[in-house]
């Protein structure tokens, strides 16, 4: 039996691809998480039925949201990543020796776990000594945080705050 993944882009356009393998399909407190494999894109992550990234193209997004701000900021030492469960932005940031601390604030612990299991080439950035991963709501984290950030990167895949934050 063939399995297909389809993502609606507009009312007139739908992207569909044949799935070779379903590696993971779980429901977290925040969203449905699927890791699938296709011939065209390799492994890819879908959240609530929408593709977040694939092995073939993740570098485009991660490099753009990381290296452009780093190129124009004169002195980055402390960075906040809002979201960042897949670790791709952290992986790019750890290449900068000037950075002393990277705080990743992600509300979905299960998403971090799924990414660690299925995308270790991305999440390796989360294991650097300068990286701290906080599993909590970003707004709540910021309200209770002392200190400043030189750079904040929004890599959120879902709402930045919950109704009780």
Language-model segments: what does each one mean?
Residues 46-47:
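A general beta-strand register signal
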